[in-house]
């Protein structure tokens, strides 16, 4: 079953009520998203062997929060929603949507915000990005969207992605429409932009007990039922792995049918879990899953595959 975004004026009253019962899609609410992520990264850095890198990621997340409010985006997406709905495509499809120069403006603002905090190799990386031409930056963005990770060094990718993510999240938060669940293609990719998830989360609150996958680009969350592989939709050979115990807040859901896994976070076990931060902080679990022969079906925005991986 797939998820489509329908223009507001094309939804009947019964569909509006149905969409409000179990929301198939949660558009990003950007207030404090990046600050909360930065705080969680710093918290998880304590007594973690990856502490230095988690603190580095926290700096980027905090810079995203600052740049978000310094450079708000105004855009009317009504026509885009109608066009995408007619085509049956995600409205902000990363493979077809033309990129505005706004994202490069965001990148340079991120660099300016981060330079005083960086030193050594990290400073050299952002200085190289600062000197890159518009064409070079567009080529790197296109390569990342095409999963051509060998064309973008893994030290540059998080900065490029941070700017692209800000741009796409700003657009996603402006979408004037409702989501409708339909039978069709699977839900392994974001219904808003077509990117990958970073992890999934079993939520609390108004969506108590429901699992939502979290987009690694536009910050949208979409519903996928529990005890079903988010990659191939099979349910007969699923297993759950953790480094702690049955009550662990972070587990990996593996599928024997397609040979992949995705992290699943439980807010009821720890209300502070965060889709990006807790995924990044549990790389030891990723190593265990690789030892067991499973491939990751997601990408963390702070950790891209390098050349040859």
UniProtKB/Swiss-Prot annotation:
Q: Which SUPFAM superfamilies does the entry mention?
A: FdhE-like
What Gene3D superfamilies does its record include?
Answer: FdhE-like domain (3.90.1670.10)
Cellular component terms, GO, for this chain's entry?
Answer: cytosol
Which GO biological process entries does UniProt record here?
protein maturation
Q: Name one GO molecular function term.
A: ferric iron binding
Instruction: Identify the main location.
Output: cytoplasm
- Membrane-spanning regions, if any? none
The protein's location, in the record's own words, is: Cytoplasm
Statement: the UniProt record of this protein carries the keyword Cytoplasm? yes
> What are the UniProt keywords, alphabetically?
Cytoplasm
Summary of the function given for this chain in its UniProt record: Necessary for formate dehydrogenase activity.
Entry's family note: Belongs to the FdhE family.
Q: Which HAMAP family match?
A: FdeH
Q: What's the name of the protein?
A: Protein FdhE
């Amino acid at each position: 079953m797939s998820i489509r975004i329908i223009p507001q004026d094309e939804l009947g009253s019964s569909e509006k009520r149905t969409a409000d019962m179990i929301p198939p899609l949660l558009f990003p609410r950007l207030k404090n998203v990046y600050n909360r992520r930065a705080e969680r990264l710093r918290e998880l850095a304590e007594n973690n062997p990856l502490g230095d890198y988690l603190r580095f990621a926290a700096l980027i997340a905090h810079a995203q929060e600052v740049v978000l409010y310094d450079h708000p985006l105004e855009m009317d997406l009504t026509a885009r929603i109608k066009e995408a709905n007619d085509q049956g495509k995600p409205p902000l499809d990363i493979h077809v949507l033309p990129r505005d120069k706004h994202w490069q403006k965001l990148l340079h603002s991120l660099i300016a915000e981060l330079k005083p905090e960086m030193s050594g190799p990290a400073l050299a990386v952002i200085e190289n990005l600062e000197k890159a031409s518009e064409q070079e930056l567009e080529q790197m963005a296109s390569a990342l969207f095409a999963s051509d990770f060998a064309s973008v060094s893994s030290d540059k990718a998080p900065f490029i992605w941070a700017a692209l993510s800000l741009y796409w999240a700003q657009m996603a938060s402006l979408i004037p429409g409702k989501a409708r669940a339909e039978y069709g293609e699977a839900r392994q990719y974001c219904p808003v932009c077509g990117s990958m998830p970073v992890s999934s989360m079993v939520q609390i609150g108004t969506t108590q007990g429901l699992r939502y996958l979290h987009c690694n680009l536009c910050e949208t969350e979409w519903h996928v039922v529990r005890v079903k592989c988010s990659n191939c939709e099979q349910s007969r050979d699923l297993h759950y792995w953790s480094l702690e115990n049955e009550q662990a807040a972070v587990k990996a859901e593996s599928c024997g049918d397609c040979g992949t896994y995705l992290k699943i976070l439980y807010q009821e076990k720890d209300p502070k879990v965060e889709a990006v931060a807790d995924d990044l902080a549990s790389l030891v679990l990723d190593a265990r899953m690789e030892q067991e022969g499973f491939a990751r079906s997601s990408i963390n925005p702070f950790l891209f595959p390098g050349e040859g991986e």
